[in-house]
């Protein structure tokens, strides 16, 4: 959608664009390497052929996005290259650093939590509350589609992941702060305290009956 927005609303920028990159491949490019996007992250663009592990010519054709405007793709953990000495010296890194592809945040978190087998899952709390299960085979059914559940490459080659999430994590706390906590924000700025510490000071010991359903 973001690429199409540029194509439809900023056609001059679109025509001058060399590559559309995500975070991992942009960092690779800035480190002087030919960028490669992990299958895990590329799937989130909705332009990856998940089963074949490469860009979908059919989807790119429908969108009118040339394949050469996207980076190469590879499995997570694929070696991209070694940071050139000149770049390493310029930014204060030791020479000889090897860079590899990464992955989408939730499957990467699952890997870090030791979720390596089909049928296992990790529960993560951050911007959102998210459950990320791992599968042995690619599976999209009427039930998963109805539940808005995706299936895409995990950060472990040969396995797949899904994500079930709700916007009740840190993003909801930020919304509350920005919407209702103007006085607390001023107090935090004056005292040097964290605004969330000030908010926590006013929280009663027992849960309240008021609930927020973040469907907005």
Task: Name each model feature, range by range.
Residues 1:
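Phosphate-handling substructures
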Residues 4-36, 41, 46-64, 81, ...:
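Active-site core segments that coordinate phosphate-bearing ligands/cofactors
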Residues 64-75:
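A conserved helix-loop-beta module that forms one wall/lid of the active-site cleft
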């Amino acid at each position: 959608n973001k690429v199409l927005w540029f194509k439809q609303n900023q056609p001059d920028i679109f025509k001058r664009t060399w590559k559309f990159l995500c975070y991992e491949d942009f960092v690779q490019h800035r480190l002087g390497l030919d960028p490669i996007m992990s299958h895990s992250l590329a799937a989130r663009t909705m332009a990856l052929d998940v089963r074949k592990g490469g860009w979908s010519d059919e989807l790119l054709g429908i969108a009118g996005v040339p394949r050469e405007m996207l980076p190469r793709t590879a499995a997570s953990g694929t070696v991209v290259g070694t940071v050139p000495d000149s770049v390493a010296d310029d930014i204060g890194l030791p020479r000889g650093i090897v860079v590899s592809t990464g992955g989408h945040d939730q499957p990467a978190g699952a890997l870090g939590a030791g979720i390596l087998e089909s049928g296992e899952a990790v529960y993560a709390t951050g911007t959102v509350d998210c459950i990320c299960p791992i599968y042995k085979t690619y599976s999209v059914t009427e039930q998963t589609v109805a539940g808005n559940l995706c299936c895409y490459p995990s950060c472990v080659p040969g396995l797949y992941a899904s994500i079930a999430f709700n916007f009740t994590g840190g993003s909801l706390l930020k919304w509350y702060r920005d919407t209702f906590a103007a006085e607390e924000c001023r107090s935090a700025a004056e005292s040097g305290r964290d605004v969330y510490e000030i908010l926590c000071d006013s929280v009663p010991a027992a849960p309240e009956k008021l609930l927020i359903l973040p469907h907005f």
